[in-house]
């Protein structure tokens, strides 16, 4: 069984083909980073138009990469939400149209379920149950996962997501968009301990996050100190350490409250090397396991949508020919498979 996956929720056009016996057969990705760089962030209208230009050519490229034709595809999965409404509509419209033309089922996929299941693409996938840390530019959530669709929200950010805080702080430091990875690179040159940032909401019970205050703290620190390269690197180091420590503390609490021994982290920020190292160290001390996808599957991609589509297709999830997307879509609303 082969599923074509289409991802167009934000500023990456991702197309992939997943085979339930052979695994990933094709993976095509186009990033719009250069398109949005001059604006310092994603411009929704430009994102939608670029998806229109790139989606079909990337589908053709994926079929060629896999050595397949349209008749070899058994279902078409597409991201139905959450995300930018215009961008979502491009992928949903193309996906539904192809499914109709090819007389195969269309499968709407939740973007964050795609991220959550991305580690399943690896050679050593996690078993249920586990705690999932979903950490990206738009989401920071801790989820109890006991099966497909069996998701309980344990905690989430009450304001900025961790990835959003990374990008905003990077902008304060004069770094180009997208700033998160560039901030991490700068932080690697920083001196630990020169500046100490707070660890938000770790001084009280609960599993919620708050990162907007860190951005304000960073802005004040930047204004109060010199603008030389080393000072900026030291501030970047202090900021990254604060975010990573906060995420680690909350993950530890979530594991303690659930009693689970496995931790899965997914989403764009899960590619952060410092975060990976700290969580791996923590899980080793707890005699548990940590799982994450390879870096290219941490950010938005079609492979995770194709895989999640396969899982949902086998569970009997399909859609009619109407084009419906959900820019806001709580993960907990998904049915169990």
UniProtKB/Swiss-Prot annotation:
Record: residues binding substrate: 134-138, 167, 180, 272
Single annotated GO MF: iron ion binding
Binding site for Fe cation: 111, 115, 300
Keyword Cell cycle applies: no
CDD domains linked: ASKHA_NBD_TsaD-like
Keyword Iron included in the entry's annotation: yes
Family classification: Belongs to the KAE1 / TsaD family.
NCBIfam families reported in the protein's UniProt record: gcp_kae1, T6A_TsaD_YgjD
Protein name listed in UniProt: tRNA N6-adenosine threonylcarbamoyltransferase
Species name: Salmonella schwarzengrund (strain CVM19633)
Gene name in the database record: tsaD
């Amino acid at each position: 069984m082969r599923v074509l996956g289409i991802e167009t929720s934000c500023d990456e056009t991702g197309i992939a083909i997943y085979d339930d016996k052979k695994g990933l057969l094709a993976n095509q990705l186009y990033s719009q980073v250069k398109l949005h760089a001059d604006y310092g962030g994603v411009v929704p209208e430009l994102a939608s138009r670029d998806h229109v230009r790139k989606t079909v050519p990337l589908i053709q490229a994926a079929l060629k990469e896999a050595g397949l034709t349209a008749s070899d595809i058994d279902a078409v999965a597409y991201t139905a939400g959450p995300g930018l409404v215009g961008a979502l509509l491009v992928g949903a419209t193309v996906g539904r149209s192809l499914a109709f033309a090819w007389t195969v089922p269309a499968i709407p996929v939740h973007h964050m379920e795609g991220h959550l299941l991305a580690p399943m693409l690896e050679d050593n996938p996690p078993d249920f149950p586990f705690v999932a840390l979903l950490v990206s530019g738009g989401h920071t959530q801790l989820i109890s996962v006991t099966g497909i669709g069996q998701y309980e929200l344990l905690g989430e950010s009450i304001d900025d997501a961790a990835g959003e805080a990374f990008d905003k702080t990077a902008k304060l430091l004069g770094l180009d968009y997208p700033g998160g990875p560039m901030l991490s690179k700068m932080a690697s040159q920083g001196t630990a301990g020169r500046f100490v940032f707070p660890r938000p909401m770790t001084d009280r019970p609960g599993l919620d996050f708050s990162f907007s205050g860190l951005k304000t703290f960073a802005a004040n620190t930047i204004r109060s100190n010199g603008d030389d390269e080393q000072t900026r690197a030291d501030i970047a180091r202090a900021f990254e350490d604060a975010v990573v420590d906060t995420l680690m503390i909350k993950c530890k609490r979530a594991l303690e409250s659930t009693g689970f021994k496995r931790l899965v982290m997914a989403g764009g920020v899960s590619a952060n090397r410092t975060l990976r190292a700290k969580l791996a160290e923590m899980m080793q001390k707890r005699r548990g396991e940590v799982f994450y996808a390879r870096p290219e599957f941490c950010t938005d991609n079609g492979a995770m949508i194709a895989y999640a589509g396969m899982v949902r297709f086998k569970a009997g999830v399909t859609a009619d020919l109407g084009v419906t997307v959900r820019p806001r879509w709580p993960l907990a609303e998904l049915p169990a498979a």
